[in-house]
């Protein structure tokens, strides 16, 4: 879509210009090894590294002159191999930043890819070597790399029907999952009724609704916190499972009159989960033991974050947040590993900002401008299909995320989406209604709705950059945009996304 004719104003209140910038103010398993030794699976990892059977490459030939067997340039390979033994990829905005693609690329150079929090509300879209699209919600994005073991950690809430649907879809397309997906025995089970009461809860809130994905994430974490939740390990004890499920369903019926529960529902669910338990058994693993054993054996581990810091239960725009910790702290609590072993964290941020659902959005572009940016970037939720709200890159929020997580570097995604614009704005400062500057990202939602955003306006490049693979080949204005972001947040940008394909990535 050509959006070059549009100057995407954020409804400025006042505008001032200077030679360089203009500012505007805006309201803004181990398979079968769970009861034995974990070294068997780790040894298999080493053998796979020695005997790779498939070369995965992009459908588009990279322009770099020297590439490894996965289509990564020599400079890119050097950048990836410099990452620490335990590294992580986390979102810097309100989710949907494109984390899955980077994880998919990095996974080829790691032994293990692990999810530590969230559930099926995390939607990651990745592509295989034939360009086929996969939308994953529970299975880590590293699954397309057959040498990688994927771990679903104790901090994840697992909806078994959804997990099996993803596994079936992957295997029907030739992606082997047996022995490659390990599900923590400590992870909590998310039931269909959690999804039902998620909708009932939203209906209760009426106009104050949070805008959840209605995947049952919040209700499941609520069950966990009030200590009547059911864990994966409970599937091994079908003698007590019915009583635990009855208590859980009875509590839900007592709280929500609209939720109809009776003996027949319990019988049906118990029979259903007996079958699920049998199928899941080969995947169930003490992942805390597995992860720490892998660390001691110097295996490389990549942590794939779901959602993003601005949706964190503690640091996000509460209550318009998720129910877990998608920031750095969630890695340790969601996998059972020590803080001292966690090394490089890469923050993923779009070249602009999007948000799904309700909640403050200081740099949102209202009206036609937001609609055009949404269609140019195909901004529709992977999990829900809902249109995402769109706006300019919020430097204040990004700097806040960098402070919380201590990112070693950033991955700037979807830079190509801005290619048709004649000018691009960066939200660089928050001001109180009286004009005074806020020195931090506020927790007060009323203040977030009232504050004014000061923008810098940079020149656009108005040319197609999707085939470029070297940073120096980007138009000058595109490089100035990247470098201005680095300057404002104080964190280097090492990866730049310029398209959806696996190879559409610039290593800086």
Curated annotation (Swiss-Prot):
Enumerate the active-site residues: 96, 124
Q: In which pathway does it act?
A: Purine metabolism; AMP biosynthesis via de novo pathway; AMP from IMP: step 1/2
Q: Name one GO molecular function term.
A: adenylosuccinate synthase activity
The cofactor named in the record is: Mg(2+)
| This protein's GO CC annotations | chloroplast
Chloroplast keyword on record: yes
Task: Give the location in the cell.
Answer: Plastid, Chloroplast
Pfam families, per the entry: Adenylsucc_synt (PF00709)
Query: Quaternary state and partners of this protein?
Result: Homodimer.
Q: What is this protein called?
A: Adenylosuccinate synthetase 1, chloroplastic
Organism name: Capsicum frutescens
């Amino acid at each position: 879509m050509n959006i070059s004719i549009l100057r995407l104003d954020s409804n400025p209140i006042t505008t001032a210009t200077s030679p360089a910038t203009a500012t505007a103010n805006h309201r803004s398993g181990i398979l079968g090894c769970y009861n034995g030794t974990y070294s068997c699976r780790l040894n298999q990892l080493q053998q796979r590294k020695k005997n790779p059977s498939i070369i995965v490459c992009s459908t588009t030939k990279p322009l770099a002159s020297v590439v490894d067997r996965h289509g990564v340039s020599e400079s890119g390979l050097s950048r990836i191999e410099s990452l620490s033994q335990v590294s992580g990829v986390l979102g810097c905005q309100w989710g949907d930043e494109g984390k899955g693609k980077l994880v998919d690329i990095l996974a080829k150079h790691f032994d293990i890819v692990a999810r530590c929090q969230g559930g099926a509300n995390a939607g990651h879209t990745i592509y295989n070597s034939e360009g086929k699209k996969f939308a994953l919600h529970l299975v880590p994005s590293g699954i397309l790399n057959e040498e990688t073991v994927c771990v679903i950690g104790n901090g994840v809430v697992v909806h078994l029907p959804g997990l099996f649907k993803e596994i079936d879809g992957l295997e029907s397309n030739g992606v082997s999952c047996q022995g490659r997906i390990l599900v923590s025995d400590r992870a909590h089970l998310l039931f269909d009724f959690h999804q039902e009461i998620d909708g009932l809860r939203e209906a209760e809130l009426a106009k104050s609704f949070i805008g959840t994905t209605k995947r049952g994430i919040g209700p499941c974490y609520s069950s966990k916190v009030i200590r009547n939740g059911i864990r994966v390990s409970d599937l091994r004890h079908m003698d007590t499972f019915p009583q635990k499920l009855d208590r859980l369903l009875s509590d839900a019926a007592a709280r929500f009159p609209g939720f109809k529960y009776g003996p027949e529902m319990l019988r049906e669910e118990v029979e259903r989960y007996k079958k699920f338990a049998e199928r899941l058994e080969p995947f169930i693993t003490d992942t805390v033991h597995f992860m720490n054993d892998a660390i001691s054996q110097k295996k490389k581990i990549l942590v794939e974050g779901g959602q993003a810091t601005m949706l964190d239960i503690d640091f996000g725009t509460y209550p318009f947040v998720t129910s877990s910790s998608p920031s750095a702290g969630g890695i340790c609590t969601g996998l059972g590993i020590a803080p001292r072993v966690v090394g490089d964290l890469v923050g993923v941020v779009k070249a602009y900002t999007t948000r799904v659902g309700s909640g403050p959005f200081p740099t949102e572009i209202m009206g036609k401008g937001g609609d055009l940016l949404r269609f140019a970037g195909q901004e529709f939720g992977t999990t829900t299909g809902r249109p995402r709200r769109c706006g300019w890159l919020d430097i204040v929020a990004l700097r806040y995320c960098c402070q919380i997580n201590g990112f070693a570097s950033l991955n700037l995604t979807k830079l190509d989406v801005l290619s048709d614009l004649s000018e691009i704005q960066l939200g660089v400062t928050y001001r109180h209604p009286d004009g005074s500057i806020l020195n931090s990202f506020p927790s007060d939602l009323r203040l977030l709705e009232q504050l004014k955003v000061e923008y810098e306006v940079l020149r656009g490049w108005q040319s197609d950059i999707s085939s470029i693979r070297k940073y120096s080949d980007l138009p000058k204005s595109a490089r100035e945009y990247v470098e201005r972001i680095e300057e404002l947040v104080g964190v280097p940008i090492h990866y730049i996304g310029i398209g959806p394909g696996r190879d559409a990535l610039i290593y800086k």
